[in-house]
Every structure is written in structure tokens, then in C-alpha cells.
From Swiss-Prot:
GO terms for cellular component: plasma membrane. Keywords: Cell inner membrane, Cell membrane, Ion channel, Ion transport, Membrane, Transmembrane, Transmembrane helix, Transport. The gene is mscL. This is Large-conductance mechanosensitive channel. GO terms for molecular function: mechanosensitive monoatomic ion channel activity. It comes from Bartonella tribocorum (strain CIP 105476 / IBS 506).
Amino acid sequence: MFKEFKEFALKGNMIDLAIGVIIGGAFGSLVNSIVNDIFMPIIGLITGGIDFSNMFIQLAGEKQATLSAAKAAGATISYGHFITLLINFLIIAWVLFFFVKAMNKMRRKEEGESPNKTSSEEQLLTEIRDLLAKKK
């Protein structure tokens, strides 16, 4: 049983998956840093320093000054938090779009530089075509 587990755990696909998860986690941290440390301050400057995360509608109880106090007092609709998450999502999607676009461009460039190799099927079909052309 241990031998089977060892074979499973050390297969190339499992190791590739583990590496992908680790790199994905690191990439997620990098993208979050780009959003929170670069783009959100710029958006804050453009919007005049509006803090969307503290915008809410209080459904019950007395009117409160902060979201945390309003949540403690009763039901709230935290639409500002939703706006903040929506902005974060759009920025992350935008950054990832350009990253993937650049990666695809590099891939196409690399594929274009490789010599155009014909497959064995194509070679066989070419030979058959040539033989048929000679018989005519």
C-alpha cells in the first residue's frame, strides 16, 4: 500500500499540480499586492478619498456612524463592501487579461520561430499524391 501511494504521489502530474498550486498562491499574492498597493490608492485619489467599505444601509436599530457598530446594532446592507470587492475583481481581471494576453503573444512568437515540421501522416499523404500524379 505504501509503495502504491509513493508511486501516486511522485508521479509527474502530481508534482506538477503541487508546483502549480504553490506558484498560483504566490501569483495570487502578487496580484493582490498590485491591486491593493498600486491601483486602489490611485482609485482613492481619483474618487477623492472615498472609503467605499464603510458605506451601508442600516435596516434595524438606531443610525450608527460605522459599519461595525451598525452590524452590532442589527441588520445591515453593506453595499460599500460589495463595491470595493467589485472594483478589486475588475482590476484583478484586467491585470490577468493583460498578463495572459502577453503570455499568449510570447507563445505564438515561439511557435512561429520553430521550424515547420511535417508529420508522418502529411509525408505519407504527399507521397501518395505524388504517386497518383505520376500514374496519370
